[in-house]
Curated annotation (Swiss-Prot):
A motif ('HIGH' region) lies at residues 11-19. CDD domains: TrpRS_core. It comes from Mycoplasma genitalium (strain ATCC 33530 / DSM 19775 / NCTC 10195 / G37) (Mycoplasmoides genitalium). The gene is trpS. This is Tryptophan--tRNA ligase. Coiled coil: none annotated. Its EC number is 6.1.1.2. GO terms for cellular component: cytosol. Keywords: Aminoacyl-tRNA synthetase, ATP-binding, Cytoplasm, Ligase, Nucleotide-binding, Protein biosynthesis. Belongs to the class-I aminoacyl-tRNA synthetase family. It comes from the Bacteria. HAMAP family: Trp_tRNA_synth_B.
Amino acid sequence: MIKRAITGIQASGRQHLGNFLGVMQGLKQLQSQYQLFLFVADLHAITVDFEPTMLKDNNLQLVKTLLALGLDYGKVNLFLQSDLMEHTMLGYLMLTQSNLGELQRMTQFKTKKLAQKRNSNNTITIPTGLLTYPVLMAADILLYQPDIVPVGNDQKQHLELTNDLAKRVAKKFKLKLKLPVFIENKDTNRIMDLSNPLKKMSKSNPDQNGVIYLDDSKETIIKKVRKATTDSFNKIRFAKKTQPGVTNLLVILTALLKEEVNHNLSKKIGSDLVKYYQNKSYLDLKNDLSSAVINVIESLKFKKAQITDEMVLKVLNDGKNQAKKVADETLKMFYKAFGLTSNQLFD
């Protein structure tokens, strides 16, 4: 029996190179090994302030980007999280079994809480969705009873909570729940900011020169890579502690050379990047990186332009139908265990 994987991608803004290398690039490998359920996490996107028209456009652009990756949608079930009410229904059941203390201890909640703007009376309004976010994530996962869950390093604590909740519910309600294995792509999980290589690449970073977006122009990409922080060693090597900027550029280039569109560049450089750049300058490295980034992003743009609204709707509808079959079965199991629904009153 084929094993199952689940992963969600949040459509809270423009997608950047960190999203591509950290999550999207690994999807092709996942689809060859697992039955993959892939969802656009639009319910998670509304846990913070949002604009409906922009959210809808972000959803569409993310779906088109995912379609442009060339995944086999006979193997991959792509859908919108909000299209399946089972996510929120199980989310509420799990919420009743969580406690305030464990949710308030979540590092991401603490960080986002501090980032909230102060009101005119110097108080802070904290959206409840920030607090309950990891419980919905637990429901997203448990709903499909997956064997593995690809994760980012910043989500590890949430996934530990998922396991804690699953064990708690399983023991209390005598449920047989599969505890998934969480896997992390350590090579590309933390693509760092080009301007500040000590920070993860993120659309929330103040200096946007360090973030390469998947819709950036060729000129913008070249400009951002040229300005990328390096050092005064003039030595190209993997040395994260002493040369974080150069190391980040090498990590990004290594990942991008795996893409088919960079076949010729990969052939030129070879498998040993440090050896190839031994007698070359930082500018040489940046020029090659610019070419590699442009090749990937321009290819994605071209493929996205070929995707019609009909293609989007068909893939999402097919994915939703397949996901619903699994989600329905799991939710029925939880409802029965919790003693819910009228047809159980006289059992």
